């Protein structure tokens, strides 16, 4: 993974009201921060919104790549069209299925330089991941953009 990679985390029930802010954040990451590699999951609403926004950005920036993070292998469900690649983090082979998504997400946070998030709900796996990401940001290891509060969440 590279420090110019960007990962996405958000709640599975995130709605389309964050789409405009998400598109703006992706454009900023490409044009101002030099991000070329975007990674997203494929299990929730925010994952879908992020993937769709990156695919739209790729029309203006064909050098951008979109990779789907796989917490399970095999994936277990069909992927949305448009991904350039899939990625299964090392060490996931023995992780129980119920822990696979948070573990894979944590691996990505630890190995990315940028995070675009939409996290607002306390006491959730996503909030726990956000706290881990914030600890990395405080140490200068990660740059976070949190879209929470844009639209209705």
Please give the residue ranges for each predicted region.
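Acidic/glycine-enriched connector segments
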Residues: 1-152
